[in-house]
């Protein structure tokens, strides 16, 4: 009876240690799983657009990571901290300023536009809380996310 409990406990420990790493999900080698998605940290800095393109080409359905809960963010931050030290990491959120619905404070419609050719993309840090934005053309590490 003691041996049965020991073996059962051992199997439970193995199962729990593998859950959340992609073993229970159908993630490619080197990718980690969480909540029906697979994630991978890439340590070669790229612009936001190049990182998104890289993610799209790396595996079917992959994009820069989108974060939908504090638990998912904690998972990604932990994954990043295992791979990189304090780094700026692109996520899949961006705002192209010249494509927004803008209006003047006096209520007049915006007809004339003279936007600079700059867009802003969102990044996070593995050591600082909160999301920040910066020019998309700047280089940063990134995390890709794909359906499991």
UniProtKB/Swiss-Prot annotation:
Pfam families: Lectin_C. One of its GO terms (cellular component) is extracellular region. GO terms for molecular function: toxin activity. Residues 34-145 form the C-type lectin domain. Expressed by the venom gland. Keywords: Disulfide bond, Glycoprotein, Hemostasis impairing toxin, Secreted, Signal, Toxin. Residues 1-24 form the signal peptide. Belongs to the snaclec family. Interferes with one step of hemostasis (modulation of platelet aggregation, or coagulation cascade, for example). Shows greater sequence similarity to the beta than alpha subunits compared to other heterodimer snaclecs. This is Snaclec B9. It comes from Macrovipera lebetinus (Levantine viper).
């Amino acid at each position: 009876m003691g041996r049965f409990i020991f073996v059962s406990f051992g199997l439970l420990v193995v199962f729990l240690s593998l859950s959340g790493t992609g073993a229970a999900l159908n993630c490619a080698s080197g990718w980690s799983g969480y909540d029906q998605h697979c994630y991978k940290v890439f340590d070669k800095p790229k612009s936001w657009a190049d990182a998104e393109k890289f993610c799209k080409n790396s595996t079917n359905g992959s994009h820069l990571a989108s974060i939908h809960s504090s638990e998912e963010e904690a998972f990604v931050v932990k994954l990043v901290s295992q791979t990189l030290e304090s780094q700026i990491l692109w996520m899949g959120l961006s705002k192209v300023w010249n494509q927004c619905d803008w209006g003047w404070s006096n209520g007049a419609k915006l007809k004339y536009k003279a936007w600079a050719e700059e867009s802003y993309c969102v990044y996070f840090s593995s050591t600082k809380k909160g999301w920040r934005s910066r020019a998309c053309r700047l280089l940063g590490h990134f995390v890709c996310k794909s359906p499991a």
